[in-house]
């Protein structure tokens, strides 16, 4: 049997970079890791509550965290940053306050910056949110995947593979369905592949979505 490995971890140091950049003593490492998770969860929850476009996409591609002794720099890569900034210019400050309250920092400064992504639908996280929104609205899974593949084609990607597992379309027996378009060379380390796994709650139960996007070869 072929062993499945996470494509991002497999390519760390070649085509993929780390999303958290900091150093810690071995005994404090787990604490730093939990801190990162709290920051990411807090940001995602805030965005979920405050912005949603009609398709159900929050638009966060990834969150990078850089830590120094006195400063934590958080960079949010978003596909649709206007949604967070428009209407309420103080939203970023509010978000900063929320995260600071969650982590109760006293002597550490927190700085949040938002970076816009040029082709949002070329990122698996945003695409998974789009498919999840469609499945929640009871759109048939094939239709949802086809639409997602069309969106990635506009983003100049070389290939995409989408897999959905669970009680698809409310069927009694859970199954796994997948569709591939173009090339997705998972064995090639120099191939830059973006990947995400996403859970979506529907009225029939939980579905798992996995997306592999072949961006380019280095």
Swiss-Prot record:
GO biological process, one term: translation
Subcellular locations according to the entry: Plastid, Chloroplast
Pfam families from the UniProt entry: Ribosomal_S3_C (PF00189)
PROSITE patterns, per the entry: KH_TYPE_2, RIBOSOMAL_S3
Alphabetically ordered keywords of this record: Chloroplast, Plastid, Ribonucleoprotein, Ribosomal protein, RNA-binding, rRNA-binding
Molecular function GO terms recorded: rRNA binding; structural constituent of ribosome
Primary residence: plastid
Annotated Gene3D superfamilies: 3.30.300.20, Ribosomal protein S3, C-terminal domain
Single GO cellular component term: chloroplast
The keyword Coiled coil belongs to this UniProt entry's keyword annotation: no
Residue intervals of the KH type-2 domain: 47-118
Tagged with keyword Nucleotide-binding: no
Oligomeric form and interacting partners: Part of the 30S ribosomal subunit.
Record family assignment: Belongs to the universal ribosomal protein uS3 family.
Name of this protein: Small ribosomal subunit protein uS3c
């Amino acid at each position: 049997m072929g062993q499945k490995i996470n494509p991002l971890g497999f390519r760390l140091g070649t085509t993929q970079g780390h999303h958290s950049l900091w150093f810690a003593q071995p005994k404090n490492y787990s604490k730093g890791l939990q801190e990162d998770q709290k920051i990411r969860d807090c940001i995602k929850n805030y965005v979920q509550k405050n912005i949603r476009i009609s398709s159900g996409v929050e638009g966060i591609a990834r969150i990078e965290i850089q830590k120094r002794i006195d400063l934590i720099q958080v960079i949010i890569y978003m596909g649709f940053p206007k949604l967070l900034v428009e209407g309420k210019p103080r939203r970023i400050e509010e978000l900063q306050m929320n995260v600071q309250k969650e982590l109760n920092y006293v002597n550490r400064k927190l700085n949040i910056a938002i970076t816009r992504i040029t082709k949002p639908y070329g990122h698996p996280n945003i695409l998974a949110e789009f498919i999840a929104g469609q499945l929640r609205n009871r759109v048939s899974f094939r239709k949802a995947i086809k639409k997602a593949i069309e969106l990635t084609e506009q983003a100049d990607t070389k290939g995409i593979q989408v897999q959905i597992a669970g009680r698809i379309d409310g069927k009694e027996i859970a199954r796994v369905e997948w569709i591939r378009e173009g090339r997705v060379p998972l064995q090639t380390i120099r191939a830059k592949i973006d990947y995400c796994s996403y859970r979506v709650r529907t009225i029939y139960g939980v579905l798992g979505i996995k997306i592999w996007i072949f961006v380019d070869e280095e």
